[in-house]
Design a protein with these regions (language model features):
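Membrane-interface "cap" regions at the ends of multi-pass membrane proteins
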Residues: 1-45, 58-62, 70-74, 83, ...
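C-terminal membrane-solvent junction of multi-pass transporters and transport-like membrane proteins
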Residues: 154, 343-355, 390-445
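A generic transmembrane alpha-helix motif of multi-pass inner-membrane proteins
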Residues: 376, 380-386, 420-477
Length: 638
């Protein structure tokens, strides 16, 4: 096997780990701020709250797995809502997601200086934490405009280091400070915490699962979504549960709740400006608080402080960057569906990045949130958007199952568990998850006036703008899906930036990939090499087929990628299971809003009986594609 082929096979094996690492880097980073924010409300019941929120997260992860496998496109709950309901519901879900990303950027950037305060103490207090947080946001926006890309290998390394560090703290904590007696004494039911604070802490704990949307956003780059996405989500869930079901017990054992002057206090929930028992509060750097209260030697504690300060700030920086990328991607997608003006799709002439979307939603608005300097507000505003969009996602999956029962759609993957009643496979995970997130949303709206006005105001402003834009500018119904037109014409005839190339085991495919690379190379375009596995009607779409079909499909995509490497063009491989190859090609091109499909076809002898000129699949694509189609006919045999 050639060196190139060995390297490509290694990269293919790293598909699921890379997807897991990126998702865990976003979800796992939230432990560095969620622990302190939740403790403000839950006090001694913080571990119980994380368990309850974890069960809701498990249901939500199952929902996102099924929806993303079915519709492997960026958008998450917005995409699910578009297919299950209509464009108006999709917009509201997307607008709530936008709030999630904005809050993620603000809260992650704000907590970076607090962990770096191990090097300079003023960073943990105003105004330096706000100033440094704003600098982080500005730097991330500039880096994303220039187009700096993350390395999958670095993400894997950081995810492993992050998980190993958190696991080490858990093990040390259980050995040195864990005490069931202390944990029991921490709780005064109905008093510390009060019932209202306890119920409010559950939606706030959703902050701990920041980044589940990342899986959906990365699905477009996953080679085989049906296989890699469920595995990656499962690994993320296991890793997250392992930490969130253990570290809070250690934290409350190390920093117990005390009754002082009529108030119940724990260092874990106090802001850094307040002091208790000779220490400042650790609300804004809770994991550092765990390190400082494990009872380790001064030298070992100091080493751990420095190591954790560097690691946590790096993970939070990457988490904030994921928010910036997510905000720009969802803005770009919303513009593509005419939910926002096309100006947000404007690409920088030099760097080819959506710079307006990055500046507005990745920079300006997060900076406004950061100026508040209130971690409780930042956490609650994220919980508002998250519970709303999660509830829409659960409802969309339930709706899809009902459509499937009526024969409207075919679902390639079903998450567990399900209950079949009257011909419908009701998704129990979506039902229970929807109840959990829906009730959590109501709790936030009812109990927190500031979030009620800010969150509902955000949704209302977005809705009013959407109505105005749709009726006065687009002149389209609110519920109709409208795609942005693809720029076609003499001036841009050869400026193809998104090319779909179906590949099969014929030399015509090699000619098609070669032609596509020549079209894309001048404009830094990307190519989607698509291979369709046609599944017989008597088998489910996720059935394993005989004859090493999947291995052959992966080999095809490796060959296409090798051709792209020779041209310096990024080739993204995608395996799709479908009943008909032609329909799958058309759907994939429309989903990605591709500008052209390049297909290889054999030359046919026209002296025989009449039939399709290039073959049934090519003719179907020519008749039904929403974009241009170019056919690369193979040269005649000598």
């Amino acid at each position: 096997m050639s060196r190139r082929r060995r390297q490509q096979r290694l990269e293919r094996v790293l598909g699921t780990p890379a997807l897991f690492a990126t998702a865990y880097g976003n979800v796992g980073s939230s432990i560095y701020y969620a622990l302190g924010v939740v403790a403000v409300y839950a006090l001694g019941l913080t571990p119980v709250v994380f368990i309850i929120a974890g069960l809701i997260f498990a249901c939500t992860a199952a929902t996102y797995t099924e929806g993303t496998v079915h519709y492997p496109e960026a958008g998450g709950s917005s995409s699910f809502a578009r297919h299950a309901f209509n464009e108006l519901v999709s917009f509201e879900a997307a607008w709530a997601q936008m709030l999630n990303y904005i809050a993620t950027i603000a809260v992650s950037a704000f907590f970076v200086p607090h962990y770096l305060s191990v090097f300079w103490a003023p960073l943990r207090q105003n105004p330096w934490d706000i100033v440094f947080g704003i600098v982080v946001i500005v730097l991330l926006v500039l880096l994303n405009i220039v187009g700096i890309q993350e390395s999958a290998r670095i993400n894997v390394f950081l995810a492993v280091a992050d998980f190993a560090t958190q696991l080490l703290l858990v093990l040390l904590g259980f050995i040195l400070v864990f005490s069931p007696a202390v944990l029991k004494a921490n709780v005064q039911l109905g008093v510390a915490p009060t019932w209202s604070s306890f119920f409010l802490s559950i939606p706030i704990a959703m902050l701990a699962y920041t980044g589940i949307e990342t899986v959906s956003n990365l699905s477009e780059e996953a080679r085989d979504p049906l296989r890699t996405i469920p595995r990656a989500v499962l690994f993320v869930a296991i890793a997250v549960f392992a930490i969130y079901f253990t570290l809070p017990w250690v934290a409350l054992s190390a920093m117990p709740v005390h009754h002082v002057a009529g108030e119940y206090k724990t260092l874990l929930a106090l802001p850094p400006t307040e002091h208790f028992q000779g220490q400042h509060g650790y609300q804004n750097d809770p994991v550092l608080g765990v390190v400082n209260n494990l009872g380790l030697s001064h030298a070992f504690t100091h080493v751990l402080q420095i190591y954790l300060g560097i690691l946590a700030s790096t993970i939070l920086f990457i988490g904030a960057n994921a928010g910036v990328i997510g905000a720009s991607r969802i803005t770009y997608a919303m513009s593509g569906y005419r939910q926002l003006p096309l100006g947000f799709r404007k690409i920088h002439p030099r760097f080819k990045t959506p710079w307006i979307a990055l500046v507005v939603f990745g920079g300006a608005i997060p900076i406004l949130l950061t100026l508040s300097g209130q971690t409780k507000f930042l956490g609650a505003i994220y919980a508002f958007g998250a519970t709303f969009s999660f509830t829409v996602a659960h409802a969309a999956i339930i709706r899809m199952r009902m459509q499937q029962a009526r024969g409207g759609i075919e679902i390639p993957y079903r998450s567990r568990f399900n209950l079949r009643v009257r011909g419908v496979d009701w998704p129990l995970f979506a039902i229970f998850g929807g109840l959990g997130t829906g009730l959590s949303f109501l709790v936030i709206v009812i109990q927190t006036p500031s979030i009620r006005y800010a969150g509902l105001g955000w949704l209302l402003v977005g809705f009013l703008f959407y109505v105005f834009y749709r009726r006065r500018v687009i002149h389209a119904p609110l519920t109709e899906t409208v795609r942005a037109p693809i720029a076609l014409g003499p001036a841009v005839a050869l400026e193809y930036r998104s090319v779909i190339v179906p590949v099969v085991w014929r030399r015509e495919s090699e000619a098609a990939v070669d032609l596509a690379c020549r079209l894309a190379v001048e404009r830094r375009g990307s190519i989607i090499a698509l291979t369709v596995i046609e599944v017989p009607l008597d088998l489910p779409l996720d059935a394993r087929l005989p004859g090493n079909v999947e291995d052959r499909a992966n080999d095809l995509l490796d060959e296409a990628r090798a051709i792209g490497d020779a041209y310096g063009v990024n080739v993204i491989g995608r395996i799709v299971r479908a009943r008909r190859a032609g329909r799958a090609i058309v759907d994939e091109a429309e989903r990605r809003n591709s500008e052209i499909i390049v297909m290889g076809a054999p030359r046919r002898d026209r002296s025989g009986p009449r039939g399709p000129i290039f073959g049934g699949t090519v003719d179907f694509v020519l008749k039904n594609a929403h974009c241009r189609v170019m056919v690369a006919a193979a040269p005649r045999a000598a």
